[in-house]
Design a protein with these regions (language model features):
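Threonine-centered tandem repeat motifs in low-complexity domains
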Residues: 233-237
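RNase H catalytic domain
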Residues: 2-4, 82-86, 125-215, 239
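RNase H-like nuclease fold core
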Residues: 57-118, 129-134, 217-218, 222-232, ...
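Phosphate-ester processing/binding pockets and catalytic centers
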Residues: 37, 103-106, 112, 136-146
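Short, conserved alpha-helix that lines the donor NDP-sugar binding/gating region
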Residues: 120, 124
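Non-catalytic propeptide/linker segments at domain boundaries
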Residues: 46-60
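Residues that form generic nucleotide/phosphate-binding pockets
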Residues: 17, 35, 188, 192, ...
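Short, low-complexity, charged amphipathic interaction modules
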Residues: 1-46
């Protein structure tokens, strides 16, 4: 129950007692209730969406508490990426939670031409960036927190827990002396991780009824459906105008 609802409920109990007691304060209590209803805005959740050209979703539903978070300074970032055609149109998504399971932020973004790996990387990267913004807004010290980035992409998790260290040691080159694919994204991922400090990447099996992972997957695919439907409609309209 919101704070506003609790205040009104308490006042109405008092009002009922005043009415039954036939006290002159009944009318006064009515005016107090009216004032509360008009003056207090409905309570809003302490969630934040990234300030970017992205499609944000407000209906998160109920999620369980993040599986790795053990203290108030532990936070979880779930991310996902999708691509149709690979390469082709794609989308990334991210969702941030605290230890209690409260959704702190969520976002999804569409790309006209990309790959699945780039979208998986982008989901994790943008999720970390959003957490940094959230921490700054609510005065949370990055020195105190531990972040768990949870993804169903082995590419992301193995890259950040194993490959990046070797690439950096070789001047961002692979063992065969070639530049890693999506190198600019890997570099940015590494920089953002270092700016936070304590970040651990965890793998979760995709399409295995994991609520947060399934939600991120749904955000990606719903955004893709919407964007591609809009594109097809626009193309159809242009073709019709030529006849």
């Amino acid at each position: 129950m919101s704070q506003k609802s609790q205040i009104i409920k308490t006042l109405k109990v008092l009002q009922k007692w005043l009415k039954e007691s036939r006290l002159d304060l009944f009318d006064v209590s009515s005016k107090i209730i009216q004032h509360v209803e008009e003056s207090y805005p409905d309570d809003a959740p302490k969630s934040k969406t990234a300030k970017s050209k992205s499609l944000h979703f407000s209906q998160t539903g109920d999620f369980p508490k993040p599986e790795y978070c053990q203290s108030e300074f532990d936070f979880a970032i779930y991310s996902d990426g999708a691509c149709r055609g690979n390469p082709g149109p794609g989308a990334w998504s991210s969702l941030g939670q605290n230890m209690e399971g409260e959704v702190l932020f969520q976002a999804a973004s569409f790309s006209e031409q990309t790959t699945n790996n780039r979208m998986e990387l982008s989901g994790a990267l943008e999720g970390m960036k959003q957490f940094i913004e959230y921490a700054a807004e609510f005065h949370i010290s990055l020195k105190k927190v531990k972040i768990y980035v949870i993804s169903d992409s082995r590419y992301v998790v193995d890259g950040m827990t194993s490959w990046v260290k070797g690439w950096k040691a070789r001047g961002w080159k692979k063992a065969d002396n070639k530049v890693p694919e999506n190198c600019e994204l890997w570099k940015e991922m590494d920089e953002v991780r270092e700016s936070i400090g304590n970040v651990e990447f965890k793998w979760v099996k995709g399409h295995a009824e994991h609520p947060q992972n399934e939600y991120c997957d749904r955000m990606c695919n719903e955004l893709l459906d919407r964007e591609l439907s809009s594109t097809n409609t626009s193309t159809s309209t242009r073709n019709d105008s030529l006849h």
